[in-house]
A protein has these predicted regions:
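Carbohydrate-active catalytic/glycan-binding domains of CAZyme proteins
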Residues: 1-308
């Protein structure tokens, strides 16, 4: 409720018969879930990364999964599978009511049904990005007279970032922002690194924010010749983000020229003033006596335990 404190309330897919990951390799499985709200329903889209390598005909690497519910805590619908072999889906509804799955690489639009359960047309490429490596994590935002195409670029390691382009036509052409990269950590010794894959949100006061992926490495990154690493480059073995990808929040400001900047162009903040919303702090889950027949919702595993 305050955009800072969060409480785990459930899971979108709970039936193993609906999503069997028992044979899926480590680091594969469900990737990059995105949640949106449309027509009174919460819609979650995600990628299922399969074991295939995509190097042979009909060797599908990825499928897209969609579930929905009229309540954020669920229960959610049975999964619908959209056969689009890519990653990082998100949901966009245009002013004319048409629904699209937005998917990488770059910004591509896949026409889908109003309930988001079926592909209804061919994939439409609209913006490849700025030319940096790994254009992914795509979102489309309609604001004022423009469509904004928001991308993660630079790879998901050190040098990860957020770039944006805009167009007055959904299908382009898009021009890149003169303020790119909108988000990137340029200080190799900063405690927050690998910042990218962001999604904008407007709060109840009309203020804008971006949630984004980030990581906190065990130690800093070596600087060569006084320069920070290039996008995707790691110079020090062992500069690992042990707890994995985390979530950052920074303010967004719309400019008079119609573009926006994140955190005044300063990169990710180490500390930030919270949104001006009533604070809601949930009790921390710290103990489990295992006195129930079912595990608490907070227990999570990479895969379900094997039977027996």
């Amino acid at each position: 409720k305050d955009m800072v404190h969060w409480e785990l309330i459930g899971h979108a897919i709970t039936d193993p018969d609906e999503l069997d990951l028992s044979d899926i390799r480590d680091s594969h499985g469900i990737w990059a879930p995105d949640i949106s709200y449309s027509n009174g329903r919460f819609i979650i889209m995600a990628t299922l990364r399969l074991n295939a390598d995509g190097k042979r005909d009909n060797n599908v690497m990825r499928r897209q999964v969609v579930v929905s519910s009229d309540r954020p805590e669920g229960p959610y619908s049975k999964p619908s599978w959209l056969e689009v072999d890519s990653i990082d889906p998100s949901h966009f509804v245009d002013d004319d009511g048409k629904h699209y799955m937005v998917i990488s690489p770059g910004i591509n639009l896949v026409p889908i049904s109003d309930d988001c359960t079926r592909v209804t047309g061919d994939l439409i490429p609209v913006w490849p990005g700025t030319g940096e490596r790994c254009p992914e994590g795509p979102h489309i935002l309609r604001h004022g007279d423009y469509y904004y195409a928001i991308l993660a670029e630079g790879g998901t390691g050190y040098g990860h970032g957020i770039n944006v382009g805009r167009s007055k036509n959904l299908f382009g052409p898009y021009e890149a922002s003169p303020y790119n990269p909108l988000m990137r950590q340029l200080d190799p010794n900063a405690p927050i690194q690998r910042t990218g894959h962001g999604k904008l949100i407007e709060d109840a006061n009309g203020d804008w924010w971006v949630y984004y992926l980030m990581g906190r490495p065990n130690r800093g990154i070596e600087v060569a010749n006084g320069k920070a690493p290039k996008p995707g480059e790691i110079r020090v073995p062992g500069a690992y983000t042990t707890v994995g990808r985390e979530t950052g929040l920074d303010p967004v400001r719309w400019l008079d020229d119609g573009w926006f900047v994140i955190n005044e162009g300063k990169g990710p903040s180490n500390e930030q003033t919270a949104p001006d919303l009533p604070e809601v702090v949930y009790p921390k889950w710290q103990r489990d006596d295992f006195d129930s027949d079912t595990l608490d919702v907070h227990w999570q595993f990479v895969r379900r335990p094997a039977p027996g």
